[in-house]
Amino acid sequence: MPAKRSRTFRQSGSALLALLAIILLMNISCTSAARDHRRQTNLEAKVGSHVVFNCYIDFPFDAPIPYLVHWTKDNKKIFTWYEQETSTSELFNGRLHLVENHPEFGRASVNLTAIRESDQGWYHCQVSFPNRSPSVRNNGTAYHLAVQGGSLIRIPPVNQTIREGQTAFFHCVMKHPENSQASWYKDGVLLQEVQDLVRRFYMGPDGSLSIDPTMMSDLGEYECKVRNSDGELQTAKAFLNIQYKAKVIYAPPEVFLPYGQPAVLDCHFRANPPLKNLRWEKDGLLFDSYNVPGVFYKMNGSLFFAKVDENHAGSYTCTPYNDLGTDGPSPVISVIVLRPPIFSVTPKAIYIQKLGEAAELPCEAIDRDGNNRPSIIWGRKDGQPLPADRFSLSGGNLTITGLVEGDRGIYECSATNEAATITAEAELMIENIAPRAPYNLTANSTETCITIRWQPGYLRPNLEYTVWYRLMEAPEWRTLRVLDKKVMEATVQHLQPGKEYEFMVLSQDKYGDGMFSKQFRFQTLPSPIRADDFDAQQLQHDLGQVTAPAGGLGAPWNLTAISNQQGWLLHWEHPVQGLEGLRLYAVRWWKEPEHFLIGHAETFDNYYQLRHLKEDTLFKVQVLAVGTETQQSVPSHELLIDVPSQRKVRALIIGSSVGVIFLLCALCAFLYVKRSCLRHLFAKDSSASEDEDTAESGDCDSDEQDQRDRDSIKIRQST
């Protein structure tokens, strides 16, 4: 028994020693972590600049709980934050703010702006948890701020937020006012040149600025520039935020809305702080769009009428509100429902005239009520002006005399009243003058691609282009259809390196084929490696070692695609050569194997998000680098994207889940049956063993009785 007790005591002592060792190690690790977390950091800043003191919070068990933040300077408390309430010392008032929701800084970090020379010193962050015991953990960071000397400004200006009508005051105390001069700027403009501020600002002898009274237009960035006699210059900036009640700045006396069409009734207001509510009244009563069918509130408070009718006419007023209140309702806006004009006479779709003749294009319109005549204006759809000395207007009819080749094109007649504008188009064609074919063909190339561009011969609606091309040695032509009617370029791919190709551009419209352009020849760049060495060529292309065109601009390289929730994110590397001449990137994608152009886009970044790609489809993507001067474009290598079918994936997941569940159920049933069988077998074995034990015990009793009988007989015989 004593040996057992001693063994128990030895085990308890070993466990206690192990526990003490673990606690000691944890204490050492926590102390080292605290020392590392509270290491001192040296920072430098100039007068008038800003600096961020970073301070992370170590929550217990990584669970955020209420915390208290203290910042001290040279062991004097300067800033306190607790539950969205702050307290700042007078010297740092308006200059020290908590940094909120920034991924690079901790929750207890602060930003010190408008730094002064007196801000130099030691800063310490301390975080505590009032509702937890112990309330202090390993939170805290120490910083030493060194303010660079030799400046001209002793006290820089500080950002201010005041109410309209109050006085704004900015410090700009010069270090040596006897040989320095200060000047103030608002948004980069000298204050003496700002007409609204000329009579309301005053500069003190030390360089400080005061504005009295302030107006809402005074909001902006103010900059103080101090220059000494030696020509040294120092600047400091501060922002002035003017807050005022929400007010209406403009309200038209009358607004015409088109009958039967959508329309918007705006309320022109300004508010700082931002708008919180906008109240509309009609004919002196509250106008709630939620109770009026077909009328909705827009995000800016405007009224949107889905379909204007006579019931929407009336006298409207709007009243904006913000946190400071309202400056009052707007003047009355009389809303008049007016029917849009209709054409009584419209021009024909096509007019064919001869050179030197006159063309007359009729156009007349009336209001639906027949009382007023809308104003009619003629113009060309391509934006070119009408011939000043050869056209005349009579009512709504346009007459052009002495027709020349340049007069052909599409003309628009616009009829306008106070409610809406309607248009009608007519095309003027000159007889015996064939439509001009595409011209001014230009191109640039890589080893396997040629991008060709052209100018349209003439502008017509629904005009389509087809590029015809062939190898100079080949007898047959190939075609590439340009599906986007607004694009005047095409990229022919899968060409042979170092070969010359011939091109023609055919314009087509709904009236039939047009004319071919002049034949144009261009050569692909020679390949520095063998054409059959595809792997080496692809590797060289991926690494961006593509021979630059004549302009020196290289091709984008390392084009990749990553699937995400929005679709596919494309990413590529900038060209190795000619990056200074890069203007933008053009992204194009086709549906394969039809090689059908799905879309194109332009971006200034080296990435682009592809959205809404059709499932279970193969797409080909290419990125072109577009230059600034010569408008050249250099394509990257092609990338294939196989968009999987989400339906198949979902079906596979559901089928797999059902299969796994079925297997689990089968396994559970098998285990249950097996356990029942084993339990039944064990029950039989136990009953059999009990019977055998009973039989054996009976035999033993009979033997013992016989032995006793024999012993009794022997005793009697001996007696």
Swiss-Prot record:
**Which Cys-Cys disulfides exist here?**
C55-C125, C172-C224, C267-C318, C363-C413
Entry protein name: Protein borderless
Q: Where is the composition biased (Acidic residues)?
A: 688-704
Organism, as annotated = Drosophila melanogaster (Fruit fly)
What CDD domains does the annotation carry? FN3, Ig
**What's one Pfam family the UniProt record gives for this protein?**
Ig_3
Q: Does the keyword Ribosomal protein apply?
A: no
Asked if Phosphoprotein is a keyword of the record, the answer is no
Domain Ig-like: where? 40-128, 134-241, 246-334, 341-429
Checking InterPro entries in the record gives: FN3_dom, FN3_sf, Ig-like_dom, Ig-like_dom_sf, Ig-like_fold, Ig_I-set, Ig_sub, Ig_sub2
Describe its partners and assembly state. Answer: Interacts with tutl.
- Record-annotated Fibronectin type-III domain positions: 434-527, 555-646
